[in-house]
Every structure is written in structure tokens, then in C-alpha cells.
Amino acid sequence: MPLHHLTRFPRLELIGAPTPLEYLPRLSDYLGREIYIKRDDVTPIAMGGNKLRKLEFLVADALREGADTLITAGAIQSNHVRQTAAVAAKLGLHCVALLENPIGTTAENYLTNGNRLLLDLFNTQIEMCDALTDPDAQLQTLATRIEAQGFRPYVIPVGGSSALGAMGYVESALEIAQQCAEVVGLSSVVVASGSAGTHAGLAVGLEHLMPDVELIGVTVSRSVAEQKPRVISLQQAIAGQLALTATADIHLWDDYFAPGYGVPNDAGMEAVKLLASLEGVLLDPVYTGKAMAGLIDGISQKRFNDDGPILFIHTGGAPALFAYHPHV
């Protein structure tokens, strides 16, 4: 078993059973390709999402260290911050969130609805900053201040994207391999690539479990030149902790995130509408809408290795739909 070292890491069970892997018949007919979806949007806490996989490992480590406070950072509409705050509430921990307004909007819906509304319901302590220019350093400064107030803080990086957090997506690769066995021979997997932990964890896991499968990361905030070193750095760190080699190339498409992180675009919103109308599946304007736009265009432009089945990783994010309506 190539990933047996995964069991060495403490893990807090937050998700339970594997998330569904489903065939999308109407989208498949529409695109002329077999399309499957991994439903990490339906994880069980606080409207779901992929970050719970990372939090299973990160919060287990926080509890092991005796922390009573989780500190993390992200955009006002961060799905990661929302899920971290929910887990903190569930466990009776304090949560401090350092937030930025990356799109500089004054739209009330963006500033108060969606994920931001949920943070208030989870009784999260909100700290605003002008910009997360150096989030690791900014989080450490905040942790020092919180510690001076008598708390025992544990810092969770942006997106939960550390080598430890990314173990959650090595675990996801195991689920995918087991769910696909004798059911479907995948050719490609498509995932949104942002803080890079989800992408890197899948890269390590799939390289060892499904080495013939092409993994495509659709960037949501950076060019390939900016994003690839981030994914590779985490890929190598994960592999090192699992005593594995990781030699698979990292494939990224950066044609679909303009005009920038957190700013909806036409192709992404069309993808949101398409999945909702054809399959009753809700994507979001920031991550999965843009990643699905990449999948759709990738088929049209023949960018995939072959014409075989494609799996789309649904990382969640639907609460942001309410924050982005009608526009920002």
C-alpha cells in the first residue's frame, strides 16, 4: 500500500462516510463526454465544502497541542474561514478570522451576506486588514496578540494549505480510486487550484493510485508561472512526510480566472447556470464556476489527453452565490 504512512497522522473525523462520486448524465449528453463529479460540496458541516478534509488533520493537531483558539485568514467570502469557524463552534473552540476585501467592493451583499453572515452566526471574532500581503506573518502577529490575551492559539494557514492539511486530499485520492474501481476508467480529473493544498494532495495521491489519470488544476487567482511553484512546493512536502517520491508533472490552466481572484466572469457564471439547470448542482462564482468553465472549454478546444471520462472535483462554495447577487 503506497500511502500507508497516511495513518500516522492524527485525524479528527468530521466527514464520516466518503462523499458521493456521481455520473452527470445530462451534462454528459450536453458536452458529448462522460462527466463525473466528486461531491465534496456535500460534506456535513455548515453547508459543506472541501476544507473539512484539511481540517480533519489540522484541528486534530490543534487539539493535540492543547489549543483553545483557531486562527485563520481569507477573503470576506472565504469558504475556508466559514468551515474553520463552524468546526471551532462544534468543538467549543474560539475562532479568530483575519479578513480582507480582495475585490475592493462596497456592495452590502458581499460585505454582509453569504459566508460573512455565517461567520457571525458561528460567533467568530473578526479582524479586518487592508490586504493579506504576507498572510503567514500576519497570522503569526495576530496569534501573538491573541496569546497575550490568555488564549492558546493554533494558526491554520490560508485555505488550510499546509502539507499536513493537504493530507486530506491524499485521503480523497484514496476515496476516488476505490469509488472508480471496476466502475469507470477515468482519463482526467479537473480541480480548482487556489491555495494549492487540494491540488497538491490530489497530485500525490493520484500519482501513486491512478498514475495514468491526467490531473488538471484550473487556477482561480494566479498565472501558471505564479501557481506552479506553490503546488510543487506542497507536493514535495506532502511526499516527504509520507516517505514517497512525487515526480508527476503539475498541469495548470490559467485561462479562466480573469479579471482576478474573487471577481466573477461570464464563462464562470455560465457554467454555474449550466450545472444548476442541467443537474441541480450548485457551483460558485469564485472557484468551481471558473474550474467548470475550464473543463467545458477544455473539451471544446481538445485540451485533454484523450476523449475519456472526466471527473470534476466539486470543492463547494455555494454560500457565496448569495453574496455575489446581483453583482459586485
Curated annotation (Swiss-Prot):
GO MF annotation terms: D-cysteine desulfhydrase activity
InterPro entries listed in its UniProt record: ACCD_DCysDesulf, D-Cys_desShydrase, D_Cys_desulphydr_bac, TrpB-like_PALP, TrpB-like_PALP_sf
Entry-annotated residues carrying N6-(pyridoxal phosphate)lysine: K51
GO biological process terms on file: D-amino acid metabolic process
Enzyme class, UniProt record, top EC level: lyase
Coiled-coil boundaries: none
SUPFAM superfamilies, alphabetized: Tryptophan synthase beta subunit-like PLP-dependent enzymes
Domain of life of the source: Bacteria
Entry-linked Pfam families: PALP
EC number: 4.4.1.15
Cofactor(s), names only, from the UniProt record: pyridoxal 5'-phosphate
Chemical reaction(s) catalysed: D-cysteine + H2O = hydrogen sulfide + pyruvate + NH4(+) + H(+)
Keywords noted in UniProt: Lyase, Pyridoxal phosphate
NCBIfam families noted in UniProt: ACC_deam_rel (TIGR01275), PRK03910.1-1 (NF003029), PRK03910.1-3 (NF003030), PRK03910.1-5 (NF003032)
Function: Catalyzes the alpha,beta-elimination reaction of D-cysteine and of several D-cysteine derivatives. It could be a defense mechanism against D-cysteine.
HAMAP family reported for this sequence: D_Cys_desulfhydr
Quaternary structure annotation from Swiss-Prot or TrEMBL: Homodimer.
Family per similarity comment: Belongs to the ACC deaminase/D-cysteine desulfhydrase family.
Protein's name according to its UniProt entry: D-cysteine desulfhydrase
